[in-house]
Swiss-Prot record:
Domain of life: Eukaryota
Binding-site residues for substrate, renumbered to this chain: T100, S117, P118, N119, G120, T121, I122, R123, R132, R155
SUPFAM superfamilies: Isocitrate/Isopropylmalate dehydrogenase-like
Protein name (database record): Isocitrate dehydrogenase [NADP], chloroplastic
EC number: 1.1.1.42
Species for this entry: Medicago sativa (Alfalfa)
Transit peptide start and end: 1-21
Length: 433
């Protein structure tokens, strides 16, 4: 389902760089990347990013999948599955934000079905862990000013409350948890609670050793790559067996494959109680990876985003347990409100930084897999150009609002395209330096 016309020949003539012509030698990339296009305002931004910040400098073989809602509907969501399978094949995917349809969207687009979240589908196929990390600009005030370094949060995106079975209990009676083993073996029959009054509520949830182990491997790999310490948070003092299993598996994985590497890198792995960890996070300066169980990761990633200032400055990378397959995207949605203005021909000022960083993080991973130092250098220069532009006072409206508050006026910010043009100009300066 990808478009072959987006695959550029590896035998493209080399353009040598000269300051006189401002021509750039395009960086050759040996292996393909998977591109997943998206919806609404982020789809508009996505094209600007490719045309102004990526294609003029990098010669890419792109396996293109259109994950825009109309095409997902046309293919009965097969395109989403195919894009995830291609990611497993090529190891690097870069994804634009997409709509997860609700009833209103089914009506708006005339959909055949209320298709599932593309992120959920992709996550299940890749069996990955989602890592979110803020982009820090020195001049954008943070709600928690002590956070001078990023905190990268890894959320175990499987099981627990999100795959649980819950029930309302009507009246008195016994609640039991029963496990029936396959084949031989005795049934385990645990009495949970004896309801005597009007009843109440009950919940049964689970996780698997395989999934916890994958989560541990991905977390260890990310922390080592960043050369930051790793913390796992649980409540094993209360859930001695359930959370205790997370603690034990992480420790096993660490000692079996990572301890010597961590010691050589001067970093460490440590288990912490979730309440201690939240208190530590609040008073720390940042600079670590925080591995969270599913629910904790859901809550704490939003707490971090707000503390650092903005979801518009938050990257999201799905890391697979093989350590070499990733999918990079922005942590925010499709910016529908701005898209409605754009549809009417109005001016928008949409923050493209997290979408640009989806490209840089994806390409940086491709560079590491291919041992392509030139490509890695390009991604670092593009990230520095983004941050440099904001720190020089040129930014989109959302960031200007954090800076100027009620005194905000039009001269304080650039529109959507002007901001990307400013980043492109800064990038060219950095490349030709």
């Amino acid at each position: 389902q990808f478009s072959p016309n987006l695959s550029f020949s590896a035998f493209f003539p080399i353009i040598t760089f000269t300051t006189a012509t401002m021509g750039f030698q395009k960086i050759k990339v040996a292996n393909p990347i998977v591109e997943m296009d998206g919806d609404e305002m982020t789809r508009i931004i996505w094209k600007y990013i490719k045309d102004k910040l990526i294609f003029p400098f990098v010669e890419l073989d792109i396996k293109y999948f259109d994950l825009g809602l109309p095409y997902r509907d046309e293919t009965n969501d097969k395109v989403t599955v195919e894009s995830a399978e291609a990611t497993l094949k090529y190891n690097v995917a870069i994804k634009c934000a997409t709509i997860t349809p609700d009833e209103a969207r089914v009506k708006e687009f005339g959909l055949k079905s209320m298709w599932r979240s593309p992120n959920g589908t992709i996550r299940n196929i890749l069996n990955g862990t989602v890592f979110r990390e803020p982009i820090i600009c020195k001049n954008i005030p943070r709600l928690i000013p002590g956070w001078t370094k990023p905190i990268c949060i890894g959320r175990h995106a499987f099981g627990d409350q999100y795959r649980a079975t819950d029930s309302v209990i009507k009246g008195p009676g016994k609640l039991k948890l029963v496990f029936v083993p396959e084949g031989q073996g005795e049934t385990t029959d645990l009495e949970v609670y004896n309801f005597t009054g009007e009843g109440g509520v009950a919940l049964a949830m689970y996780n698997t050793d395989e999934s916890i182990r994958s989560f541990a491997e991905a977390s260890m790999a990310v922390a080592l790559e960043k050369k930051w310490p790793l913390y796992l948070s649980t409540k094993n003092t209360i859930l001695k067996k359930y959370d205790g299993r997370f603690k034990d598996i992480f420790q096993e994985v660490y000692e079996a494959g990572w301890k010597s590497k961590y010691e050589a890198a001067g970093i460490w792995y440590e288990h912490r109680l979730i309440d201690d960890m939240v208190a530590y996070a609040l008073k720390s300066e940042g600079g670590y990876v925080w591995a969270c169980k599913n629910y904790d990761g859901d809550v704490q990633s939003d707490f971090l985003a707000q503390g650092f200032g903005s979801l518009g400055l938050m990257t999201s990378v799905l890391v697979c347990p093989d350590g070499k397959t990733i999918e990079a995207e922005a942590a925010h949605g499709t910016v529908t409100r701005h898209f409605r203005v754009h549809q009417k021909g109005g001016e928008t000022s949409t923050n493209s930084i997290a979408s640009i960083f989806a490209w840089t993080r994806g390409l940086a991973h491709r560079a590491k897999l291919d041992d392509n130092a030139t490509l890695l250098d390009f991604t670092e220069k593009l990230e520095a150009a983004c941050i440099g532009v904001v720190e020089s006072g040129k930014m989109t409206k959302d960031l200007a609002l954090i800076l100027h508050g009620s005194k905000l006026s039009r001269e304080h910010y650039l529109n959507t395209e002007e901001f990307i043009d400013a980043v492109a100009a800064e990038l060219k300066t950095k490349i030709s330096a």
